[in-house]
Amino acid sequence: MLFNQTLTYISLFSGAGVGCYGLLEEGFECVATNEILEKRLNVQRINNKCKFNDGYICGDIKELETKEKILKQIEFYSKKFGNDRVDLVIATPPCQGMSVANHKKKNDEIKRNSLVVESIDLIKQIKPRFFILENVPSFYKTGCIDKNDNLLEIGSMIEQNLSSDYMLYDEIINFKNFGANSSRTRTLVIGVCKEFKDFISALEFFPDFKEEKTLKEVIGSLKPLSWGEYDSTDFYHSFRTYPKHMQEWIKDLKEGQSAFENTELNKKPHRIVDNKIVLNVFKNGDKYKRQKYDSIAPCIHTRNDQMASQTLFTLKMIECFPLES
């Protein structure tokens, strides 16, 4: 916390900084943000996420140099602004190796899963008042390789390393029950420094339960778009064109139906190889599926009422981005 009582945080695996946007709206100040891809950090720069350019740290969290840059920025805030301690560390390690949506898993995914170990290592060094880890539902039970080259469940690794200093709470929740406009089931792990055990518990961090919204309630008032059309009131509400032959796949679908359910071969998702129809592999049950207007929005696919994918504007509404962002 700074001299002026402003709460501080550090974001690991921060992507384009979407999650951090909410923290900034709540008055937190970002001491450092770490992301391996420069183009994602550039989005954060555009949104002025950090006050100082040194706060944008591009690099692999496994590298000592990257960790030292984060720790150096913490020291800078301590000396310059009286930050007695980082209040919050948030980490969302890559989940591709754990996600059921990833059908292209590689044999070395457990190494990528083990990036969470680097997060825990930094939390031990930073000693924040609180930390939050967020990931896929299987997160806590997924295997990782710890610093001693032992294979163990991520949950066990977290508890072994942090339970002596933090009260730990993990739960699988669906964010649709807490104000999100789409169905998103995730594991949350919340750590509260034991110094505060008599004052606060992890459960107090959860927002109040909210009634879920249907897709119609979220985007139903927006203007329908024709092929290639832009809404004159918002550039980002625009019809994203796609290969015309795909229209046959989706034009006759009813709400909730997938193009893979079409009975005619040429209306199923496919490609042409040697003048023959080769069907696409049916991996995700909701791919090429027309959404239901009176249900909570799933992952992003074909609209319910148009032969189109969602626009950037509707995606912002479904994913709860601030519309002015």
Stretches found by the model and what they are:
Residues L2-I126, P137-K141, I145-L152:
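Core alpha/beta nucleotide-donor-binding catalytic domains of modification enzymes
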Residues E35, E134, S325:
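Acidic-residue sensor for enzyme active/binding pockets
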Residues A91, L133, H301-T302:
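Redox-cofactor binding/interface segments in oxidoreductases and associated redox assembly factors
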Residues T6, R186, A297:
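A residue-level signal for beta-strand positions that form part of recognition/binding surfaces
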